[in-house]
Protein backbone atom coordinates (compact mmCIF):
# COMPACT_ATOMS: atom_id res chain seq x y z
CA UNK A 1 0.00 0.00 0.00
CA UNK A 2 1.33 3.43 -0.96
CA UNK A 3 1.49 6.25 1.59
CA UNK A 4 -1.24 8.12 -0.28
CA UNK A 5 -3.49 5.05 -0.05
CA UNK A 6 -2.75 4.78 3.67
CA UNK A 7 -3.63 8.44 4.16
CA UNK A 8 -6.94 8.02 2.31
CA UNK A 9 -7.79 4.85 4.24
CA UNK A 10 -7.11 6.53 7.57
CA UNK A 11 -9.03 9.66 6.59
CA UNK A 12 -12.09 7.61 5.65
CA UNK A 13 -11.90 5.66 8.92
CA UNK A 14 -11.41 8.80 11.03
CA UNK A 15 -14.40 10.56 9.44
CA UNK A 16 -16.67 7.64 10.36
CA UNK A 17 -15.21 7.19 13.84
CA UNK A 18 -15.33 10.57 15.50
CA UNK A 19 -12.93 12.84 13.65
CA UNK A 20 -9.36 13.90 14.24
CA UNK A 21 -8.11 14.80 17.70
CA UNK A 22 -6.70 18.25 18.35
CA UNK A 23 -3.19 18.93 17.09
CA UNK A 24 -1.63 18.87 20.56
CA UNK A 25 -3.47 15.67 21.48
CA UNK A 26 -2.11 14.06 18.30
CA UNK A 27 1.41 15.17 19.17
CA UNK A 28 1.04 13.84 22.71
CA UNK A 29 -0.22 10.52 21.36
CA UNK A 30 2.67 10.31 18.87
CA UNK A 31 5.11 10.94 21.71
CA UNK A 32 3.44 8.15 23.70
CA UNK A 33 3.72 5.70 20.79
CA UNK A 34 7.37 6.59 20.13
CA UNK A 35 7.99 5.98 23.83
CA UNK A 36 6.44 2.52 23.55
CA UNK A 37 8.67 1.77 20.55
CA UNK A 38 11.72 3.04 22.43
CA UNK A 39 10.83 0.91 25.44
CA UNK A 40 10.63 -2.22 23.29
CA UNK A 41 13.96 -1.38 21.61
CA UNK A 42 15.54 -0.88 25.03
CA UNK A 43 14.24 -4.24 26.21
CA UNK A 44 15.50 -6.05 23.12
CA UNK A 45 18.77 -4.29 22.40
CA UNK A 46 19.60 -2.20 25.46
CA UNK A 47 20.56 -2.90 29.01
CA UNK A 48 17.07 -2.86 30.51
CA UNK A 49 15.51 -6.31 30.61
CA UNK A 50 11.77 -6.83 30.88
CA UNK A 51 10.15 -7.72 34.15
CA UNK A 52 8.73 -11.22 34.34
CA UNK A 53 5.24 -9.68 34.44
CA UNK A 54 5.72 -7.74 31.18
CA UNK A 55 4.43 -9.29 27.99
CA UNK A 56 6.22 -9.43 24.67
CA UNK A 57 5.56 -6.46 22.39
CA UNK A 58 5.94 -6.49 18.63
CA UNK A 59 8.38 -4.07 17.02
CA UNK A 60 6.25 -4.22 13.88
CA UNK A 61 3.10 -3.25 15.77
CA UNK A 62 4.85 -0.45 17.67
CA UNK A 63 6.25 0.95 14.41
CA UNK A 64 2.82 0.71 12.77
CA UNK A 65 1.32 2.65 15.69
CA UNK A 66 3.87 5.44 15.11
CA UNK A 67 3.14 5.39 11.37
CA UNK A 68 -0.62 5.60 12.03
CA UNK A 69 -0.17 8.76 14.09
CA UNK A 70 2.19 10.35 11.55
CA UNK A 71 -0.33 9.68 8.80
CA UNK A 72 -3.14 11.14 10.92
CA UNK A 73 -1.08 14.26 11.62
CA UNK A 74 -0.23 14.63 7.92
CA UNK A 75 -3.91 14.35 7.00
CA UNK A 76 -4.87 16.90 9.60
CA UNK A 77 -2.37 19.39 8.14
CA UNK A 78 -3.11 18.52 4.47
CA UNK A 79 0.41 17.18 3.94
CA UNK A 80 1.07 14.73 1.11
CA UNK A 81 3.60 12.44 2.78
CA UNK A 82 4.50 10.69 -0.47
CA UNK A 83 5.59 14.00 -2.00
CA UNK A 84 7.36 15.05 1.20
CA UNK A 85 9.18 11.71 1.38
CA UNK A 86 10.28 12.10 -2.25
CA UNK A 87 11.76 15.51 -1.45
CA UNK A 88 13.52 14.13 1.62
CA UNK A 89 15.05 11.23 -0.33
CA UNK A 90 16.26 13.61 -3.05
CA UNK A 91 17.81 15.86 -0.40
CA UNK A 92 19.54 12.99 1.39
CA UNK A 93 20.72 11.37 -1.84
CA UNK A 94 22.30 14.62 -2.99
CA UNK A 95 23.65 15.73 0.37
CA UNK A 96 25.15 12.40 1.36
CA UNK A 97 26.46 11.16 -2.00
CA UNK A 98 29.80 9.47 -1.30
CA UNK A 99 29.63 10.31 2.39
CA UNK A 100 29.31 6.79 3.72
CA UNK A 101 31.26 3.69 2.84
CA UNK A 102 29.82 0.27 2.22
CA UNK A 103 31.33 -2.99 3.47
CA UNK A 104 32.53 -3.63 -0.10
CA UNK A 105 34.44 -0.34 -0.30
CA UNK A 106 35.84 -0.82 3.20
CA UNK A 107 37.21 -4.27 2.26
CA UNK A 108 38.92 -2.90 -0.83
CA UNK A 109 40.67 -0.06 1.00
Regions picked out by a protein language model, each given a short descriptive name:
Residues 1-63, 67-109:
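Flexible "arm" and connector segments at domain edges
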Amino acid sequence: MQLSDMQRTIDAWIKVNGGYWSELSMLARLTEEVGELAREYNHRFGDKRKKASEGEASLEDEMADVLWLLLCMANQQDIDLEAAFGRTMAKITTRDAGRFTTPETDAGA
